[in-house]
Amino acid sequence: NWFPKFTPNSNQENQTDTPFYAISIPKINIKNATVSTIDTDLAKHLVNWQGTSIPGKNGNAVILGHSTLPQLFNAKDYKTIFANVYKLKNGDDIYTILNGITYTYKIFKIVVADPNDTSALEQNYDNSYLTLVTCTPPGTTWKRLIVKARLEKI
């Protein structure tokens, strides 16, 4: 596991003020899935990694989720929710709903990285970015699939 130690008390102010928000990815049948900024239990929800931004703010909101074999996908089971992330392409939309505001992100970069590569957590403050991270190939933990998106509209 390449993720740094998670300490809820060291979250950015933005995260503790917004403990949960929702994400929808229509192309892969994810609708209003819960994202937590204060807990790392990937069996209960997706996780917005501590120290990264949140949707609508400049910076990079990094969202982690479990994947598995695509045939086991269940949009209501957080142990399988990212099983079809590999189907996403540049130009696809991701929506986040935070404090009643919908933010539309458009995917612009998809890469596969080694498990010890933490570059997905890096912050860039020139815009609002969203990064999805899951294991790949589906059903393994060999590599990390990283899907980057940029805020298009509010």
Predicted segments — roles?
Residues 1-154:
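Solvent-exposed, non-transmembrane regions of membrane-associated and secreted proteins
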